């Protein structure tokens, strides 16, 4: 009776929380904090600030009602239940043969069986080719299924099983193709990032050329001003104009820098 109630609980659409939540009371939490402070005392007898890991908490001498407050160790093997269905902890995709389903495509490329040397690398499976074949088989089997229903509907089970097997094989092939799809997506993202970086480098080179031209012009104006140090009024006026042009060129450099940085 208890097992049946537990199965109903696991299979409900919105499963209730596990019963251990009842132990998360303010008193139990306070007792756990006191035990942690007591265990973290140093040689001077004063508690030290410490970030406790679940493994360290499990190593403490805790009463049974407080042990439920400590996170359990994360399992790396075995199964877990989701709405009454067992799920494997392993992320590896099980083969159709392991699941007791007939596999309609080869496990490796047919060219691998004709290899002369076993040291040669195996060729990847042509997923698109076999997906297309399975899609055509689905259409053909569906037409046959409709024909069976029109002639002798009581013999539909075999065709339904064939359609089910074809759909499972197509779905499994798509799952096998996902790692390749992830690699292609990563390659595309890296190429976009590389193109953006090259564009930024080109903009920086262009800005560098503009600033270099302005600095060379300033240097030429400075050399020309130092080569004619006359003290006449006309030269003083020219020197004032040169100084004004130097200020304008310097302002141009800052405007260029501000514009590129803001852009």
Swiss-Prot record:
It comes from the Eukaryota. The gene is med7. GO terms for molecular function: transcription coregulator activity. GO terms for cellular component: core mediator complex; mediator complex. Its main location: nucleus. The keyword Ligase does not apply. This is Mediator of RNA polymerase II transcription subunit 7. The keyword Nucleus applies. Component of the Mediator complex. Residues 24-47, 234-247 have a biased composition (Basic and acidic residues). Component of the Mediator complex, a coactivator involved in the regulated transcription of nearly all RNA polymerase II-dependent genes. Mediator functions as a bridge to convey information from gene-specific regulatory proteins to the basal RNA polymerase II transcription machinery. Mediator is recruited to promoters by direct interactions with regulatory proteins and serves as a scaffold for the assembly of a functional preinitiation complex with RNA polymerase II and the general transcription factors. Belongs to the Mediator complex subunit 7 family. It comes from Aspergillus niger (strain ATCC MYA-4892 / CBS 513.88 / FGSC A1513). InterPro entries: Med7/Med21-like (IPR037212), Mediatior_Med7 (IPR009244), Mediatior_Med7_sf (IPR044888). It holds the Pfam family Med7. It is found in: Nucleus. GO terms for biological process: regulation of transcription by RNA polymerase II. Transmembrane segments: none annotated. Residues 1-57, 101-122, 222-247 are annotated as: Disordered. Keywords: Activator, Nucleus, Transcription, Transcription regulation. Residues 1-10, 101-111 have a biased composition (Polar residues).
